[in-house]
Amino acid sequence: QSNVVDVCGKINEMVRDYKLETVFIDETGLGGGLIDLAREQDIPARGVVFSLQEKASMYKNLRLLFENHKITLKKVDKMVYQLSYLTREYTEGGVMKIKSEEHDDYPDSLVLACRAVSSGNQWHVIDVGKGLQKALFG
């Protein structure tokens, strides 16, 4: 378990090394402190609160990306494992609720990445390592 300062330092390294324009961070719970620290260090961070509606929207988008073959996962065992434990149910108000019996850190990171590249009026190219690029996009 990393502390917020260590995580912020790692994010700062990645912003520098990969020339990232914006880092999307789950602001729910402890992530709020990470957002504050990142902003203090001039890291281009944007917080996303994982409300029921927001999380449902991001996971609907991910489902559409998979269905339309816009995203592929290869050789990412932990990601596939965690995705396989996701379930959905609906609240009395009809809002979809995404749940997992296991950790969902990898899938949550994936939906944040998908949200990041599709935000705004244009798509952005993500410069990632060849291994991760091949694993995510084939």
Residue ranges and their predicted role:
Residues 114-138:
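Acidic two-metal-ion nuclease catalytic site recognized across multiple nuclease folds
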Residues 33-34, 112-115:
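Active-site-proximal flexible loops/turns
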Residues 3-7, 102-108:
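Phosphate/oxyanion-binding active-site loops and adjacent basic polyanion-contact surfaces
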